[in-house]
A protein has these predicted regions:
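Long lumenal/extracellular ectodomains of secretory and single-pass membrane proteins
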Residues: 1-305, 315-484
Length: 484
């Protein structure tokens, strides 16, 4: 290896916030994007754009599919900000790629994502499509048939927010309508598709069809429903608990519920039934353990995400590790989930020892120590360890110079006669580029985000490399509509 090769290799190394050696790339720009895009809510727009552009140069189709996976609120990461940061950039820099995928925007996201494309080369095409859909919805409404939710997400020309009102007036202009006609049509369509906010504004609380209220609206308005329509709302929730009625939870994430209990100290029947009705992405008996980072750097939403995902998986896993997970900070602990309600369970977990360190080394070696002390065979070990963290781990005790974290832990397991289980590094708060394994490490997967739907992608990927797992997601049937 000549000096330039050494320099090139050295440029790939960085330090975590706690001083551990780590890579700043997986050696695949697309994987760098996939492994962080679900957890980049607090990164700058320039960082987000640079990451996408490098991925696009490496694999244009993969980058576009990763973009829509990131936005996908049902099967993907459900990240709105990152998607809206990238839409205008792609429309300006890769216009053809954006034009070919315009129709997919409301399929994976929402109709109001289109507003991010104002003042770009595809804006005229956007308004043509919106006008066509709006005209079609008007006809379908007159015929008493089902129509889209476009009217729900079009900006109101009489909104209280100046920016929203400005966009609403602009929308009317671009659709060739007077503000009055635009407002009248939107109100008519919103009432027809039964947008719950319309009934709330009209003080028609006793006419709200609670089983039809969308997931996030039910969460956001739960206190208003209880305040204005208490008897009927309580009756509805009791019927949900008994299985007579349904409640929508499909677009919620575990942290949505956990943070309201963990930080808001709320004990709500709505949160209880929505937790119970989250989509189940865990396929029965799964031989895996979640390791939840509860260190100081995870405070706020990342902590709620870590605890929420760990509880979600432990509850729904019907195998040997049902209701079991592990926390790690200064001292790793095995946790058995206790309690009858989600509030009781979170209150119990909040009493577990949460420290300020991020000692992932100690946590992974505790798994090894337990196996050694109890003479466990390889077959008795968990098949997979799912590590949910910001990846800002502590410096390891015996890690060699320029030895990546996964390679170090794998070496320690080997020295004691064990093979390290499959490891998933799940990043929930990517503050800068830190990767604990590269793209070719067999038995490692790199994922990101807050969504429990990621579990379904992990179940069948044990022993795959990070790149293999990524492409199993991006090239799945769900993203075949995205083309270049």
């Amino acid at each position: 290896m000549n000096f330039s090769d050494v320099m090139r290799e050295e440029s790939k190394w960085t330090k975590t916030e706690n001083g551990a050696d780590a890579k700043n790339t997986t050696d695949s720009a697309l994987l760098d994007m996939f492994a962080t895009i679900g957890s980049m809510r607090n990164r700058s727009e320039d960082e987000i754009i640079q990451k996408f552009e490098l991925a696009f140069q490496e694999d244009p189709l993969g980058a576009m599919r990763c973009l829509f996976w990131a936005r996908d609120c049902r099967g993907g990461a459900g990240e709105r900000r990152v998607f809206r940061v990238l839409l205008p950039y792609i429309a300006n820099k890769h216009t053809d790629a954006m034009m070919k995928n315009l129709n997919s925007i409301p399929e994976y996201g929402r109709w109001d994502d289109f507003y991010s494309l104002i003042d770009t080369p595809v804006e005229d095409e956007v308004w043509e499509r919106i006008k066509l859909i709006l005209d079609t919805d008007s006809i379908l409404m007159e015929q008493g048939k089902s129509c889209t939710l476009l009217a729900k997400w079009l900006k109101k020309a009489d909104a209280s927010s100046p920016n929203t009102r400005k966009l609403g007036i602009y929308t009317a202009k671009k659709l060739g309508m007077s503000v009055y006609d635009y407002k009248r049509l939107c109100v008519k369509l919103r009432r027809y598709i039964d947008v719950v906010e319309q009934r709330m504004s009209a003080n028609e609380w006793d006419t709200i069809n609670y089983p039809a209220v969308p997931s996030r609206a039910m969460m956001n308005y739960r206190k208003a429903f209880a305040r204005h329509d208490q008897e009927r709302f309580d009756e509805y929730l009791n019927k949900v608990q008994s299985g007579e009625q349904k409640i929508n939870s499909s677009t919620l994430y575990p942290y949505d519920i956990v943070e309201k209990i963990l930080y808001g100290h709320e004990d709500s029947k709505v949160l209880e039934v929505q937790w119970d009705n989250l989509p189940d992405y865990v396929d029965g008996d799964v031989n895996a353990v979640v390791m939840a980072d509860v260190s100081g750097s995870m405070s706020g939403r990342p902590m709620a995400t870590s605890i929420g995902l760990a509880m979600y998986f432990a509850e729904r896993n019907k195998g040997a590790y049902h209701n079991l997970f592990m926390t790690f900070s200064e001292s790793p602990q095995f946790v058995t989930v206790k309690g009858n309600t989600i509030t009781q369970k979170i209150n119990f977990i909040s009493k577990v020892d949460w420290g300020y360190n991020t000692d992932l080394e100690k946590a992974l070696l505790k798994i090894l120590d337990v196996a050694i002390e109890n003479y466990c065979s390889q077959e008795e070990m968990p098949k997979s360890l799912i590590i949910i963290s910001d990846m800002e781990i502590d410096c390891c005790t015996n890690q060699k110079h320029r030895e990546n974290f996964y390679d170090y832990v794998s070496r320690v397991y080997d020295e004691h006669g064990y093979k390290i289980p499959n490891v998933v590094f799940w990043n929930v708060d990517s503050r800068h580029d830190v990767f604990l394994a590269d793209k070719d490490r067999k038995g490692v997967q790199l994922v990101s985000g807050q969504s429990a739907s990621t579990f379904k992608n992990l179940i069948g990927c044990v022993d795959k490399t990070p790149v293999e797992m990524m492409y199993s997601v991006l090239n799945s049937d769900r993203y075949q509509a995205i083309q270049i």
